Amino acid sequence: MKKILLAVAAASLISFFSWADDALLKTGHPDEYTVKKGDTLWDISGTFLNSPWLWPEIWHVNPQIENPHLIFPGDLIKLIYLDGQPRITVERTLKMVPGAGGTTKLSPSIRVQQTEDAISAIPLDKIEVFLSRSRIVEPGVLEASPYILAGQQQHVIVGAGDRAYARGKFDSQYSNYSIYRKGQVFKDPVTKELLGVYAQGIGTVSVAKIDDDIATLDIVRTYEEVRSGDNLLPSEDRSVDSIFFPSAPDVDIEAQIVAVEGGVSQVGKFNVVMINRGEREGLQVGNVLAIYKTGEIVADRVRGGKVALPDERSGLLMVFRTFEKMSFALVLEADRALAINDKARNP
């Protein structure tokens, strides 16, 4: 009898794992896929998985290739089974190269590829401004920083090659500064805690010389017209980090959308949004959250009074840059118009 029960339990366990595998993999998924230029990891993950944020759970590193965590155009993504469990791995395209004595040999083409050629998790053109230009700073940081006085002969500063003057306390260890303009001040919609200040990236400068508290600057790059009063902060020593992977948060997250790029109130697919949770709460770059449309308040014409309708799941977003108390995220799916104060939770 004991053996029979063990056999039934084993069969049930196998059946459960088989069901779990079926639930993980998308119906009609391919067995392999050749990566094309313009693909994103989110697209590829969604080709194989019902829940693209489960990519880390099914990804299998191929130790036989260089940069095994990166995926390049031309790579072959394959669905394989290891110990009966589905795994996704990558095979790198091989090419023929001349060898000694007129022979040829196979060589991984990645040896001539640069890591910046790797596909990104989400479309870079949608988030580049928020990755490399703008940022969130603590209250008072901009007010305490140096500021633009004027251009040469008090002319408007137009762009690269112009000269400008700034006033304030400059740190001699920094020769490159970024120009910022103070933007929206963010507060938590529930607790009213001050979350940070949006610093809009305007351009970059190099310090030519410093006389007391006056600095002579050479404008290196501008994204908008530089104005008197714009602030200067040391340029961030960071590259555009597009190499991250879709994942579910490690902790329970209850967030809200507090702002949308461009200051609009409605949110749609590929909009950048700011949410009121960050590194302090355990959010990481690549984390995916489900967006819930806040339920309407309606009148109960039978019993009287007002009733809040349930929140409805209406989309997905991915966090691509985190700060202490808030994060930037890209809306990847939206099946209806979303808005500020809509909620974001674990998927």
Regions found by a protein language model. Name each.
Residues 11-12:
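Repetitive helical segments and hydrophobic/amphipathic motifs
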Residues 2-7, 16-347:
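Surface-exposed, polar/charged interaction patches used for macromolecular assembly or partner binding
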